[in-house]
Amino acid sequence: MVHRQLPETVLLLLVSSTIFSLEPKRIPFQLWMNRESLQLLKPLPSSSVQQCLAHRKNFLLPQQPVSPHQYQEGQVLAVVHEILQQIFTLLQTHGTMGIWEENHIEKVLAALHRQLEYVESLGGLNAAQKSGGSSAQNLRLQIKAYFRRIHDYLENQRYSSCAWIIVQTEIHRCMFFVFRFTTWLSRQDPDP
C-alpha cells in the first residue's frame, strides 16, 4: 500500500535533509525540496482519500503566528523541537494501532529520535525553552493543544484506517510548518 511507506520516506527524506543540515554555525540548509521529495508528497491515491472524506476534521493547526521573523533563532528551534517531539509521541503512542506495520513505525521513530537529538544538541535551544518569549511559548502551547486534538480524534475514531489517513495528512502539514521555520533559519547570517 502506498500509504504504508509514505510517512517513513517523507519523514526520512524531508526531515533528515532539512534538520541534519542545521549546524551550530548555521551553515545553510541543504535544498530540501528536491524532486524525489516532491514525488513522495503527492497526495494519497484518490480512492483512499475519497473513502475518508467523511472523517475529515480541522485540527486547527496554528496558522496566525507562523511567521518565524517574530522569533529569535533559539525560539524557532524550540518550536521545531516541539513539533518533532509531538509527532514522535503521537507515533510512539498510537503508531502500532494504525495502518503501518510495527517495524515500519520503529524506523520512523528512530529517524525522529535522531532529529530530536540533533536539534537538542544545537546551542540556543535549551535557553530558548527556558526563557522563551510569550509569543513563542504561546505557539508551543498551541502546538501541544493541536496534537492533543489529534490524539483525541484517533481515540474517538478507534484508530481506524480512515482516521490514520487523515492524521497522515496532518503530519504532512506539520512538516511544512517545520520547513517554513527551518527555511527561515537557513537564511540567517552566519556568526562572524
UniProtKB/Swiss-Prot annotation:
Carries keyword Signal? yes
Q: Name one Pfam family in it.
A: Interferon
Q: Name one GO molecular function term.
A: cytokine receptor binding
Protein location: Secreted
The protein, known as: Interferon epsilon
The function of this protein is: Type I interferon required for maintaining basal levels of IFN-regulated genes, including 2'-5'-oligoadenylate synthetase, IRF7 and ISG15, in the female reproductive tract. Directly mediates protection against viral, including HSV-2, and bacterial, including Chlamydia muridarum, genital infections.
Please list the tissues where expression of this protein has been recorded.
Expressed at very high levels in uterus and, at much lower levels, in ovary and cervix. Very low levels, if any, in other organs. In the endometrium, expressed in the luminal and glandular epithelial cells (at protein level).
What are the cysteine partners in each disulfide bond? C52-C162
Q: Give the principal location in a single coarse category.
A: secreted
Coiled-coil ranges per UniProt: none
Changes seen on gene knockout? Mutant females are substantially more susceptible to (and less able to clear) an ascending infection in the reproductive tract than wild-type animals.
Instruction: Tell me which Gene Ontology terms the entry assigns under biological process.
Output: defense response to bacterium; defense response to virus
Instruction: Tell me the name of the encoding gene.
Output: Ifne
GO cellular component entries = extracellular space
Q: Which residues form the signal peptide?
A: 1-21
Instruction: Please name the Gene3D superfamilies in this protein's record.
Output: 1.20.1250.10
Q: Which UniProt keywords apply?
A: Antiviral defense, Cytokine, Disulfide bond, Secreted, Signal
> Of which family is this protein a member?
Belongs to the alpha/beta interferon family.
Q: Which InterPro entries match?
A: 4_helix_cytokine-like_core, Interferon_alpha/beta/delta
SUPFAM superfamilies xrefs: 4-helical cytokines
Q: What induces it?
A: By estrogens. Contrary to other type I interferons, not induced by known pattern-recognition receptor pathways.
